[in-house]
């Protein structure tokens, strides 16, 4: 009888020990889980705080890249046209640039072109630029600049061009600068003015200027096939309506590459 009671007592002791061990395991598991969860929560909270501390300007490049990618996909799917990709910009230039406005391709308020315009007429548009506060500034001058032989001035064409661009940056210091190369005229038009044959010289200066200042040089000259492409009006200088989508796509491609 005593043995049976002893055996029963030992069984109870073993059961209590097992229960105790299980309780300890459960407590340890709970503590580990709680600690691990707290670390994840703390990490999440730290990330949120870090994001909140970031200024809007710091987040803007990331958001802009995402927006550009979404727009590129939409354009590839035929939901947008190339002109929709021009955003928060101004486009300065001569009568060639005015075609973007005249044909209804771009916002007239943002196309700051002039008939007979030269790089020296940037001053005429500084008030508009200050009002619009664009983040992208596109420039396309050259034909009239060559006609006026601006390269003969002190410091050459690049010096004059750079001075004018810096006037813009004094107003919108964070704007990205995009400089279109000069597109040559046709060989027939060149016969009317030998000055227009300086495209290569002027473009070399523009390219070097952009490299020096970390601006983006856009090679548009290649679109002309040395003046033999079917892109010109009868005067051999101005462009057909059909050329503007091609020109616009070249500009947007360069913009996306520069900002990617």
Model-predicted regions and their roles:
Residues 154-164, 195-202:
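Charged helix-capping and loop-helix junction motifs
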Residues 86-88, 132-137, 172-177, 212-216:
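Loop/turn elements at helix/coil->beta-strand transitions in domains of secreted/extracellular proteins
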Residues 93-96, 104, 143, 181-184, ...:
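A mature extracytoplasmic/lumenal domain signature
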Residues 185-260:
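Catalytic His-Asp segment of secreted/periplasmic serine-dependent ester chemistry enzymes
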Residues 1-86, 102, 258:
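N-terminal secretory targeting modules
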Residues 140, 144, 169-199, 224:
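Active-site segments of SGNH/GDSL-like serine hydrolases
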Residues 76-160:
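Conserved SGNH/GDSL esterase-like catalytic core that processes O-acyl groups on lipids
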